[in-house]
Amino acid sequence: MGGSQIWLDTTETLTVHEMLKAICVVSANDCCVAMAEYIAGSQEMFVEQMNKRAKELGMNDTTFKNCHGIDEDGHVTSSYDIAIMSRELITKHPKIMEYTTIWMDSLRDGKSELVNTNKLVRNYAGCTGLKTGSTSVALFNLSATATRDGLSLIAVIMKGETSKIRFAEAQKLLDYGFSNYQYALCGSKGDVVKCVEVNKGLMPTVELTLENDCGALIGKGQNKNVTSDINTVSYTHLTLPTIR
């Protein structure tokens, strides 16, 4: 297999929690294969699922040939596709950041030390992850994520000549984003945006509320120029029964 490993033994048992920790912190390729086999029955079947999901997400320049990213003919992607995948991961599965923000930890009752391969976790304020990768062909790569003042950014660096370069270039991109942009909150989860009449209901009206927070990315200092117009479904009244 090659690459980063924690040298799993066929006789030992690790929990999913421990496997995820090893994958996220030290890029354990053997754990990637073990998890793929656990989820799909084999690495090959898991890779099929990976490619199917990639197409669903619009990752049009990506073809996976394995589950760990080691160089293989036809195994390709782009920085844009990595950004799409990273966004999907941190927005739909935010619990992953409990692993990607670990700087140092251990497995096997402290016998196996884990130190995060992503140095920004320790050195960059607000860093939430996400993943490093390096091979002799792809060189040094990084999908870096960070959050400050409600604004989350992703910076993807590919084919850096050295490990230091990938971290420095990612930091430059993140610094630029945080220096020039901010997140403007337009409405909070649960805010009432409209009241709609209900025909033959116990109550004459029903409130339409925001399912989630909503906002927009704006230039720094442009708050005063932001107005919100929440477009609701053009109902003037509802007839029971309704389906939420």
Language-model features and meaning:
Residues M1-A83, I90-K92:
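Active-site-adjacent loops and short helices of periplasmic peptidoglycan-processing enzymes
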Residues M59-T63, D71-V76, Y80-L238, R244:
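Domain-terminus/edge residues, biased toward the C-terminal soluble/receptor-binding domains
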